C-alpha cells in the first residue's frame, strides 16, 4: 500500500512537471513570436507625442492613383489638420498610412460601395462636429503625418506581453512547487 502511494505521488509529480515545462515552453515560443512581430511594429511607430489637432479640411475621394496605378474603387476620407504648430495629414492608425497614403480613413468593408460611403460620411461628420481633438504626432519636426489612434503603443505592447508572462510565471511556479514537494518528501523519508 505504501508503494502504491509513492507511485501515485510520482505519477502526479511527473504530470505536474510536464504541465509546468509545457507552459514554460509555450511562453517562450509566444515571446519569440511577439518579439518578431509586435516589437518591430512598436519600434516603427514614431508617433509618440500626444498633441491637439485642429481640423483644416476634409474631403472624400472615390478613386485614387498611387504611383500610376489605380487602386480598387472605394471611398476614402482625406483629413488635413494643424498639429503641434504645423500642417499635417491625419491618418486613422499606422496601418491606414501603410495601406494607402492618400487616405486618412479607409472604411472597414470596401466590398459594398454604398455601405463604405455611408461609413466614411459618418466619420467625416464626426470630424466636422469636433474641430479640435487629440492626436499623436512625431516628436521630430520633419514628419508631416499624425495619427488619430495608435495601434502599436505601449499599452498594446504590455497587453501582448501579459499572457505569455502569466503563462511563464504559472509554469515556473508549478515546477517550483513540485520540486519543493519532492525535496520535502525526501527530507521526511530520511527522518
From Swiss-Prot:
Membrane side Cytoplasmic: residue ranges: 1-18, 179-191
Residues with glycosylation annotation: 80, 142
Topological relation to the membrane, as annotated: Multi-pass membrane protein
Annotated disulfide bonds: none
Main localization of the protein described in the UniProt heading: membrane
Record note on modification: N-glycosylated.
Cellular location(s): Membrane
Transmembrane parts of this sequence: 19-39, 158-178
Superkingdom of this protein's organism: Eukaryota
Membrane topology, Extracellular segments: 40-157
Pfam families, per database record: CaKB
An example Gene Ontology CC term for this record: plasma membrane
Keywords carried by this UniProt record: Glycoprotein, Ion channel, Ion transport, Membrane, Transmembrane, Transmembrane helix, Transport
Tissue: Abundantly expressed in smooth muscle. Low levels of expression in most other tissues. Within the brain, relatively high levels found in hippocampus and corpus callosum.
GO biological process: chemical synaptic transmission; detection of calcium ion; potassium ion transport
One GO MF term attached to the UniProt entry: calcium-activated potassium channel activity
Function: Regulatory subunit of the calcium activated potassium KCNMA1 (maxiK) channel. Modulates the calcium sensitivity and gating kinetics of KCNMA1, thereby contributing to KCNMA1 channel diversity. Increases the apparent Ca(2+)/voltage sensitivity of the KCNMA1 channel. It also modifies KCNMA1 channel kinetics and alters its pharmacological properties. It slows down the activation and the deactivation kinetics of the channel. Acts as a negative regulator of smooth muscle contraction by enhancing the calcium sensitivity to KCNMA1.
Family to which this protein belongs: Belongs to the KCNMB (TC 8.A.14.1) family. KCNMB1 subfamily.
Assembly behavior: Interacts with KCNMA1 tetramer. There are probably 4 molecules of KCMNB1 per KCNMA1 tetramer.
Protein name: Calcium-activated potassium channel subunit beta-1
The species this protein was found in: Homo sapiens
Amino acid at each position: 500500500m505504501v508503494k502504491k502511494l509513492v507511485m501515485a505521488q510520482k505519477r502526479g509529480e511527473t504530470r505536474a512537471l510536464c504541465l509546468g515545462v509545457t507552459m514554460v515552453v509555450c511562453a517562450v515560443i509566444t515571446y519569440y513570436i511577439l518579439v518578431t512581430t509586435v516589437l518591430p511594429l512598436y519600434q516603427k511607430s514614431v508617433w509618440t507625442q500626444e498633441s491637439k489637432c485642429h481640423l483644416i479640411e476634409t474631403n472624400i475621394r472615390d478613386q485614387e492613383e498611387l504611383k500610376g496605378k489605380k487602386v480598387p474603387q472605394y471611398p476614402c476620407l482625406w483629413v488635413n489638420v494643424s498639429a503641434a504648430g504645423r500642417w499635417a495629414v491625419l491618418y486613422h492608425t499606422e496601418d491606414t498610412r501603410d495601406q494607402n497614403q492618400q487616405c486618412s480613413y479607409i472604411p472597414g468593408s470596401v466590398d459594398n460601395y454604398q455601405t463604405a460611403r455611408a461609413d466614411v460620411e459618418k466619420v467625416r461628420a464626426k470630424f466636422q462636429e469636433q474641430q479640435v481633438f487629440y492626436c499623436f504626432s512625431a516628436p521630430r519636426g520633419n514628419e508631416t503625418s499624425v495619427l488619430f489612434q495608435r495601434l502599436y503603443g505601449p499599452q498594446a505592447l504590455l497587453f501582448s506581453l501579459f499572457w505569455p508572462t502569466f503563462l511563464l510565471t504559472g509554469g515556473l511556479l508549478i515546477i517550483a512547487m513540485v520540486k519543493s514537494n519532492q525535496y520535502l518528501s525526501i527530507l521526511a523519508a530520511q527522518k
